[in-house]
Design a protein with these regions (language model features):
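Conserved beta-strand-loop-alpha-helix hinge in the C-terminal portion
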Residues: 196-221, 235-237
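ABC family nucleotide-binding domain
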Residues: 1-185, 189-192
Length: 238
């Protein structure tokens, strides 16, 4: 990545697009604090995460960031409800089981709560992953190709779930995708090519137009990024 600079207002939905190898997943990893930039800074929720140590970064991610992986990353020895409850239990939530059940109901999996990942279809596993990502009510949700392993019908259902939960929880949603339909449903699209930010467009931008026109204070921005490069080269999406 080279000289990537942008701000994301709170509650905005953003798609990161571009060909394989353009740096999309690397950018998302930097935003999540999973990678470190070689120069520049990244602020999430007004906090510079590039200055954080690993233990503090882990706590910050647990409290502030939800992450959805293309390959689900469910714990195979835990049931659906147990997978969703894990981040809640780690954060000390007393109602972990109840909250997990509510989220699985919200994604249409009330009858599959006690099933293990191997007993679930790909679409069902991704819905469990979506529920888990929203479990701790994170102000920031990052998703790496959330529909990449799903057929078009199931992928469309997952998109609807993401947007519905986004509206209900007022979460800022940033996702990497090759799916043109998914990208067009976002309020803003960042396009990368060869590690550079090629374009920053707002095809369906409405809610945040006034913020962009008048400017916003740092507390109104959930993400601010100004980086020259990352610790590793831009990688192809798998």
């Amino acid at each position: 990545l080279d000289r990537i600079t942008f701000d994301i207002p709170a509650k905005q939905t953003v798609a990161i697009v571009g060909p394989s190898g353009s740096g999309k997943s690397t950018l998302l990893g930097l935003m999540a604090g999973l990678d470190r930039p070689t120069s520049g800074s990244i602020q999430l929720d007004g906090i510079d995460i590039t200055a954080m140590g690993e233990s503090r970064m882990a706590r910050f991610r647990r409290e502030k960031v939800g992450y959805i992986f293309q390959s689900f990353h469910l714990i195979p020895t835990l049931t659906a409800i147990e997978n969703v409850a894990v981040p809640l239990e780690l954060s000390g939530e007393r109602r972990a089981g109840e909250r997990a059940a509510e989220l699985l109901a919200a994604v249409g999996l009330s009858s599959r709560m006690e099933h293990y990942p191997v007993q679930l279809s790909g679409g069902e596993q991704q819905r469990v992953a979506v529920a888990r990502a929203f479990a701790c009510r994170p102000p920031i949700l990052l998703a790496d190709e959330p529909t990449g392993n799903l057929d078009s019908s199931t992928g469309a259902h997952v998109i609807d779930l993401l947007l519905s939960l986004h509206r209900d929880s007022s979460t800022t949603l940033v996702l990497v995708t090759h799916d043109a339909t998914l990208a067009s449903s976002m309020q803003r699209v960042l396009s990368l090519r060869d590690g550079h930010l090629e374009s920053d467009s707002m095809p369906s931008y409405s809610e945040f137009t006034d913020d962009v026109a008048t400017g916003s204070t740092s507390k109104d921005r959930v993400s601010s990024m100004d980086c020259s490069s990352s610790d590793r080269p831009a990688e192809s999406d798998l």
